[in-house]
């Protein structure tokens, strides 16, 4: 992920790959995000600002539901509105995630005790794998759009 966020500036961060697609918007002093009702291709491609919010959303929700109070909702996970604060937030979440997971005894990975969101009744190691896939998918999408953005500016 860091390779795709390095050198990223706010102009590219807020650019849209298409007129239609998931994005963030500033409303009443708060950066809010679109939320898809479907994952069909017709919704359009997401912007980098939306993808980075999506990363903070997944990590924040899983951290809260696996290691915290379990009360955090999607609406409470707001976009930061700029790339520097977003990078800082992603790094804080990464550090917190590594600290929490590293502190678990091995048997906790086989337990279902911490698997509370977005699914239950599965060993915690399956949640770890699922989260890694989601984060890497978002990172790949950011990288792909950065290629498109770079050639469009030439």
Mark where each language-model region is.
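Acidic/histidine-rich alpha-helical segments that form the ligand environment
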Residues: 78-110, 126-136
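Short, contiguous alpha-helical
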Residues: 2-76, 114-154
